[in-house]
Amino acid sequence: MASRPWQPGGPDWNADIKPGPIEIGFDYNFIMPATGDRVPCVYVENHRVVGLDPKDPIQVSFAQPVGAEPTGKDHPELLRMHPSHGHDQTIVNGISRIGYMSGGKAARWVDQDMADTITTKAVAFLEQNRNKPFFLYFATHDPHVPRVPHPRFVGKSGCGVRGDAIVEFDWCAGEILKTLDRLKLPDNTLVILSSDNGPVVDDGYRDGAVENLNGHRPVGPLRGGKYSVFEGGTRVPFILRWPGRVKPGLSDALVCQIDFLASFAALTGQTLATQDAPDSFNVLPALLGESKTGREHLVEQAGILAWRQGPRKLIEAGKGPRINKATNTEMGNNPTGQFYNLTLDLGETNNLAAQNAETVKSYQSRLNAIRNAGRSRP
């Protein structure tokens, strides 16, 4: 329902916007063109920008200014939220973004209303499709930057605006579940809640997120965070609910979101061609709680690659910076490579590469073979 199908360069925002989700099989979409900190700050419904006045056409550029819109770099006095790094171009709703935009004023979203807008659309979709099979991809903006929760959530977390945005996200998820319950659909509806990466606190705005953590450690016992090849960047929350099929419980099975394709193909009796989803494995028994094991191995990526096999993890040698200074995140780069046993050392603090030279060599060989083949599924 709210995804990010286009990146800088984009289409003509004043005409039919194609290709998009409909061209790859969706019947309907209500989406954000990019992340909330990028222009254009509008919604797209199917092929058109919502609420666009044709007399006020949209222009977008990520290379140079367009129109006469003020920027955060030149007019910081107009900002209600200042950037900490980047995010200093066109100002929309008192917040400077990545990229330049002009026009489309009637179509621009209101940041504090985004959760309500997207969730209302998702609830309507469920109501309209209650009597037939459906697939809903519901991607919230929260807790991505800029963090501007609705006033009814402000101050509710005790951990500043980032915590409040997470409370708002929790409300969004709750509305979806409550709707399924109200429509008497939960027993035959598989719901997955997950994230695209690990946490980040300062991701481009001086919003007080760092100062208001109040002892909370978003990454928990893990090392790194968003942008990192350490587990704090690549290991993400994953909750599956299917009351009619899956019993409540916990699992340590190794699975990846890419595995959804092969797993749900198996669930629905479909066959994947060899060239389709070349890195997707069928881990349906693990997802359904019928097996405690998932895939045998996993390639992780964040600039450099890592190889997970059971609890053991090889991070290949990397020449990049060890710290992303803008976000204060350990990246995982090390010129000699790293090897960890995650059962004994979940925080990846004890590099065992020197003591496991043969295993490191074997894992690196397998990683290189997959890189050269361009696929990991046989």
Task: Give the role of each language-model region.
Residues 1-104:
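Catalytic-site neighborhoods of secreted/periplasmic enzymes
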Residues 7-37, 51-52, 199-231, 245-338, ...:
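C-terminal cap/loop subdomain of S1 sulfatases and analogous C-terminal strand-loop tails that border
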Residues 24-27, 129-136, 185-191, 235-236, ...:
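Loop/turn elements at helix/coil->beta-strand transitions in domains of secreted/extracellular proteins
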Residues 39, 45-48, 122-164, 200-202, ...:
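Active-site His/acidic residue clusters
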Residues 75-90, 94-99, 111, 122, ...:
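Long, internal low-complexity/basic segments
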Residues 77-151:
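Anion-binding catalytic surfaces of enzymes that hydrolyze or transfer phosphate/sulfate esters
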Residues 95-107, 151-156, 241-245, 343-348:
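Short glycine/proline-rich turn/loop motifs
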Residues 168-206:
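Metal-dependent active-site segment of extracytoplasmic phospho-/sulfohydrolases and closely related
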